[in-house]
A protein has these predicted regions:
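Glycine/tyrosine- and acidic-biased, solvent-exposed loop/turn segments at the edges of beta-strands
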Residues: 1-225
Length: 225
């Protein structure tokens, strides 16, 4: 071949058809099915950087089901559409993290569960590799957030429960309590008021577990006025 590539395999009508092996001079290699000079069917492609794809091909691109082995130690098993990870799949990270769910154009997109090696888990909606939409995040220490997400952070309405017994239900902005919310401590005491960037801010009412008012007043950025 003019480009230094070498093909060993079956031919039909002067075209690569059937089983065959192609070695390129840059070190790439494909072994598998061919149809009319293009990769079509099942095949394994080895990249010069050490990556490897083993799976379905259609019209010379990855299409169907396949496994992609990254030289970094990462691995993807799942659906491909026109050369991109699209559909359902599992992505294993070399560090022990794992994502199971939907992909779109190579990114986590749709519904999916991400489990971190440290034990944290997120189950919910994704968009462009980021937590986006409704989802539940459980920290490795047992704290849980259930609510709205945007750009990988709690944004919107949600509920945060800690293992220490505290519960907050209300607004969030960029991961912090923001807007109107209700905070309940482990003894059942209830704080109803407003928050700004994680601090109490604005008028509030505190009641005990029986509903008796303990305190009323106003906070200004975390300080009682």
């Amino acid at each position: 071949w003019a480009n230094g590539a070498k093909y060993t395999g079956h031919w039909k009508n002067d075209k690569k058809n059937g089983k065959g092996i192609m070695n390129w001079d840059d070190g790439c290699k494909y072994e598998g099915d061919w149809k009319d000079d293009v990769r079509h069917g099942k095949g394994v492609f080895e990249y010069t950087n050490g990556d490897k794809y083993d799976g379905d091909w259609a019209d010379d691109i990855q299409h169907g089901r396949g496994t992609y082995y990254f030289h970094t130690g990462d691995r993807y098993e799942g659906s491909y559409l026109l050369g991109e990870r699209t559909g359902e799949g599992v992505y294993y990270h070399a560090n022990g993290d794992k994502y199971v769910g939907n992909f779109k154009n190579g990114m986590q997109d749709g519904k999916g569960t991400f489990t971190w090696a440290n034990g944290a888990v997120y189950e919910g909606s994704w968009k462009n590799n980021k937590r986006d939409g409704r989802g539940v995040y459980k920290w490795s220490n047992g704290d849980v957030y259930d609510g709205d997400w945007k750009d990988n952070r709690p944004n919107g309405q949600g509920t945060l429960k800690t293992v220490a017994g505290m519960q907050y239900k209300g607004g969030f902005v960029d991961g912090l309590e923001d807007g109107q919310g209700v905070q309940i401590d482990k003894d059942g005491n209830r704080f109803e008021g407003f928050f700004k960037q994680g601090k109490k801010n604005g008028p509030f009412v505190e009641t005990d577990k029986d509903g008796k008012v303990i305190k009323k007043g106003t906070y200004k950025f975390g300080r009682l006025q």
